[in-house]
Amino acid sequence: MNSCKRFPRSARICLPSEYYVAFEQGRRYSSVLLRLHHLPTSGPVRLGLVVSRRVDIRAVNRNRIKRALREVMRQIAYKLVPGDYVVVVRQTAKDVSNAELSVALLSLLRRIGALPLASIDNAMLPFFERNCSRK
């Protein structure tokens, strides 16, 4: 992947203390595949992912799930309400496709009001491409 299309460090939740705050103070929403903790903030949209070994013992499969969810968030981050979003993947997500994970995350985001009900296009985000030089 081109480095200019990656999640910048400012768009990720990195520290355990930041996860703790989102878990303790944020609102929790659940679906069959995912649990979402949302903490509204005045800063940018930030994403944290939790995929435990209970979901799948193989790291390859856990990383596939994280890549799929990260890609969805990368594409829609500019449409979201500012805040911290921590996605906890449930065991039922082990054998589902990337498309099903995407639909589950989008429906959760719509349900909490963080994403407009309009259709999502696959346009690249200006937020993540602003420092990208095209040749």
Swiss-Prot record:
Q: Does the keyword Hydrolase apply?
A: yes
E.C. number(s) listed in UniProt: 3.1.26.5
User: Which superkingdom does the taxonomy of this entry point to?
Assistant: Bacteria
Which reaction is catalysed here? Endonucleolytic cleavage of RNA, removing 5'-extranucleotides from tRNA precursor
Q: What is any one GO biological process for this UniProt entry?
A: tRNA 5'-leader removal
One Gene Ontology term, aspect cellular component: ribonuclease P complex
Tell me one Pfam family matched here: Ribonuclease_P
Which keywords describe this protein according to UniProt?
Endonuclease, Hydrolase, Nuclease, RNA-binding, tRNA processing
Q: How does it assemble?
A: Consists of a catalytic RNA component (M1 or rnpB) and a protein subunit.
As for family, the record states: Belongs to the RnpA family.
- State the protein's purpose: RNaseP catalyzes the removal of the 5'-leader sequence from pre-tRNA to produce the mature 5'-terminus. It can also cleave other RNA substrates such as 4.5S RNA. The protein component plays an auxiliary but essential role in vivo by binding to the 5'-leader sequence and broadening the substrate specificity of the ribozyme.
PANTHER family with a match to the protein in the record: RIBONUCLEASE P PROTEIN COMPONENT (PTHR33992:SF1)
Q: Per its UniProt record, what HAMAP family does this chain match?
A: RNase_P
Protein name as annotated? Ribonuclease P protein component
What organism does the UniProt record list as the source? Xylella fastidiosa (strain Temecula1 / ATCC 700964)
